[in-house]
């Protein structure tokens, strides 16, 4: 529980004041959660092993934030943050893709320009409130995002496993996260963003043949930068479950028997091979699931490393 956090009362007063207010110690937040750690080790003749498991669940609650009063129940639900968890993701719902211009003409307008910028293959957003118009009033909470600004998933878990047998040893470290989504709307809806390259996903996009007929694809068609606003929104189609399990490290070694090493005046000799970030199980196949969406996924991928070596003791 945290109290007297910095905040400004600017949200409580009309914008006509035309002045900035200094920060005060007025906001409050609360972290809720638990952690479980289980360990076991045993020896069976020459075989030694140990297993350690951990699991944690944490949620962050804005217990109190200085903000203006809600004008109605919808405003309170959509725009206010006091007494609300920080990991709620608001997006448009999914109605698939537009399959033709006729489909666009007979669907609610969603580009604010009478459909002038819409093309077959564009995402078809859900008219969630049923008013016949696709706008900001149609977004709703349907995802668990990275919590706040720290990029932590709601659930974390891991396992450390080690074993030894007649000079051989092995150790493994697994880590994972779950119960959260990422929404990489920039890469998936603006494939040539800022003049950069697009993801390989867009080889399978809606496109026209030489006769002008539309060929269906999994992703929207590409176009010049000025026409991307129709797809440049957070939507269910670009929301991914980022749960993952990663083999973070693994090491295999063998210790040479002392009756052999002492002939060379070596007290202990162990050879080993190790690897880091060996594999990841995840629904995300185009970006690392640990990359927070706040950076739009624009980070260098993690490195897979392999090491070989020996430990000597004289």
Which role does the model predict for each range below?
Residues 1-4, 40-42, 55-61, 165-167, ...:
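Transmembrane beta-strands of outer-membrane beta-barrel pores
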Residues 1-17, 47-49, 56, 60:
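Membrane-embedded beta-barrel scaffold of Gram-negative outer-membrane proteins
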Residues 14-15, 22-31, 73-99, 209-213, ...:
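C-terminal beta-signal and terminal closure region of outer-membrane beta-barrel proteins
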Residues 21, 30-35, 48, 154-158, ...:
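Transmembrane beta-barrel architecture of outer-membrane proteins
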Residues 27-29, 43-150, 189-191, 207-212:
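Conserved small-residue
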Residues 38, 51-53, 172, 271-273, ...:
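Membrane-embedded beta-strand positions of outer-membrane beta-barrel proteins
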Residues 45-47, 167-171, 259-260:
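Repeated loop/turn-to-beta-strand initiation elements of outer-membrane beta-barrel proteins
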Residues 177-270, 275:
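Extracytoplasmic gating/loop element in the C-terminal half of outer-membrane beta-barrel translocons
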